[in-house]
């Protein structure tokens, strides 16, 4: 994993290579951009906490820089990506050397999970483990060894609206052990909304279910969740930021698991590829088409995360050093969590016409190249650029299936991908961070309190 400067990427050193600059390979990345990205990613790695606040405060700097780079950003664009995320960051927490020395004991690690103040200690431990055993062996031990600890760690990868698994996917995609170490430390330190219980409940429900003659599509499963009064009414507006933990999982965990468990992938590489593409397609369709009649178009903040994280399951699917069954399990968990997030946001009405009829004066006529060039200039924390890149990946992933025998599982097809990308830029350009997206779009209150969307 040597970079353009010949320096090896290590668990503590960022060193990007021309050989690993993103899954799409659809733009030229210049050497100067790589060099400044290396410098700024290293600075972020050494100086800034993974959490700018303890609750729902993820450091997006590496996401923004790597996405900007993969979209062909100039050195100035890379610097902008860093600067836009800088003001809110806080310094690394203190290193607890005594804890680091004990984290090799799985019981100590297990009992320490959820300690955000120990992020730096987790990071130091995972870096040390990688230096001794290699980064792939470390990932295998802590995510795929099927121990009590690794099961909890794998579930925690999906916490915080998918942020740790996004981070992990970036580490895989750009072949950066230091980013992978950050992802493992982020998952270990993250607060817990009880996703582990939900994922295990889904697997238990799947094991006892009578096999369906024909597998349900992910979109059908989401519709089934919406049609259940118990599930649909589980999240309350008054749950605020805890609609997943206290709402869906607190009031209807088993019921939601029963419905979501119907997303099952046969144990073949072909099925993994197709159903990963279906998951990506469905998430993009739901995010772009969940709109409010009579209001300006605005994408939901959490549905957006369903899309931005989806790209990394294409990346994970290509990691043949991970056992096939574990890669399949990760995609099953992703799709089942997508069902829960669909419910968290109020089971929004899905209106295809809201997407197919979309136009705006900013993005009309833009192709992918023009969208890339525009979005890397946007003042943003990486969400908009990540979504556009994920949509392009979705177009490529879904293309082999959208006109074949499984076409009903792929509601987004043809030029709808480009329309969705135009909507992503057109509805966010020029907006401040608080108005780029709408939160919990299926509820009335977000729309009633947004005069800008009248």
Curated annotation (Swiss-Prot):
Pathway: Pigment biosynthesis
Enzyme class: oxidoreductase
GO molecular function: oxidoreductase activity
Required cofactor names: NADPH
EC number(s) from the headed UniProt entry: 1.-.-.-
Induction (UniProt): Expression correlates with the formation of the sclerotia and thus the pigment production and is directly regulated by the cluster-specific activator CPUR_05433.
Keywords (A to Z) from UniProt: Oxidoreductase
Highest taxon of source: Eukaryota
Pfam families (alphabetical): Questin_oxidase
InterPro entries listed in its UniProt record: Questin_oxidase-like (IPR025337)
Function summary: Baeyer-Villiger oxidase; part of the ergochrome gene cluster responsible for the typical purple-black color of the ergot sclerotia. The ergochrome gene cluster produces several ergot pigments including the yellow ergochrome secalonic acid and its derivatives, as well as the red anthraquinones endocrocin and clavorubin. The pathway begins with the synthesis of atrochrysone thioester by the polyketide synthase (PKS) CPUR_05437. The atrochrysone carboxyl ACP thioesterase CPUR_05436 then breaks the thioester bond and releases the atrochrysone carboxylic acid from CPUR_05437.
Family: Belongs to the questin oxidase family.
Protein's name in the database: Baeyer-Villiger oxidase CPUR_05427
Organism in which the protein naturally occurs: Claviceps purpurea (strain 20.1)
């Amino acid at each position: 994993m040597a970079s353009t400067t010949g320096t090896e990427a290590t668990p503590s050193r960022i060193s990007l290579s021309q050989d690993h600059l993103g899954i799409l390979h659809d733009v030229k990345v210049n050497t100067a951009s790589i060099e400044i990205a290396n410098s700024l990613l290293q600075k972020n790695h050494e100086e800034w906490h993974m959490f700018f606040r303890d609750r729902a405060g993820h450091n997006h700097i590496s996401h923004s820089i790597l996405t900007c780079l993969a979209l062909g950003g100039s050195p100035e664009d890379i610097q902008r990506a860093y600067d836009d995320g800088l003001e809110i960051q806080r310094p690394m927490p203190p290193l607890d050397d005594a804890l680091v020395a004990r984290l090799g004991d799985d019981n100590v690690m297990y009992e320490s999970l959820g300690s955000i103040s120990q992020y730096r200690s987790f990071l130091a431990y995972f870096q040390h483990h990688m230096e001794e055993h290699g980064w792939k062996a470390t990932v295998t031990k802590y995510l795929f060894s099927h121990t009590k600890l690794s099961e909890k760690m794998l579930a925690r990868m999906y916490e915080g609206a998918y942020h740790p698994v996004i981070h992990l996917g970036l580490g895989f995609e750009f072949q950066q052990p230091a980013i992978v170490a950050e992802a493992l430390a982020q998952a270990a330190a993250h607060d817990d909304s009880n996703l582990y219980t939900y994922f295990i409940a889904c697997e238990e429900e799947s094991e006892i279910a009578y096999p369906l003659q024909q597998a349900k599509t992910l979109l059908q499963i989401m519709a089934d969740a919406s049609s259940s009064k118990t599930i649909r009414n589980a999240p309350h507006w008054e749950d605020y930021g805890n609609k997943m933990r206290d709402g869906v999982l607190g009031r209807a965990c088993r019921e939601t698991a029963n419905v979501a468990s119907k997303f099952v992938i046969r144990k073949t590489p072909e099925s993994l590829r197709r159903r990963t593409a279906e998951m990506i397609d469905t998430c993009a369709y739901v995010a772009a088409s969940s709109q409010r009649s009579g209001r300006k178009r605005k994408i939901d903040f959490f549905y957006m995360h369903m899309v931005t994280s989806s790209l990394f399951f294409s990346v994970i699917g290509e990691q043949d050093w991970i056992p096939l069954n574990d890669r399949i399990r990760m995609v099953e968990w992703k799709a089942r969590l997508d069902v829960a997030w669909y419910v968290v946001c109020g089971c929004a009405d899905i209106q295809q016409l809201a997407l197919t009829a979309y136009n705006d004066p900013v993005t009309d006529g833009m192709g992918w190249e023009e969208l890339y060039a525009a979005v890397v200039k946007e003042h943003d924390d990486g969400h908009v650029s990540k979504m556009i890149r994920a949509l392009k990946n979705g177009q490529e992933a879904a293309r082999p299936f959208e006109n074949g025998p499984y076409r009903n599982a792929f509601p987004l097809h043809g030029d709808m991908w480009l329309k969705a990308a135009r909507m992503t830029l057109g509805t966010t350009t020029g907006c401040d961070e608080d108005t780029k997206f709408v939160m919990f779009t299926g509820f009335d209150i977000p729309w009633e309190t947004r005069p800008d969307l009248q």
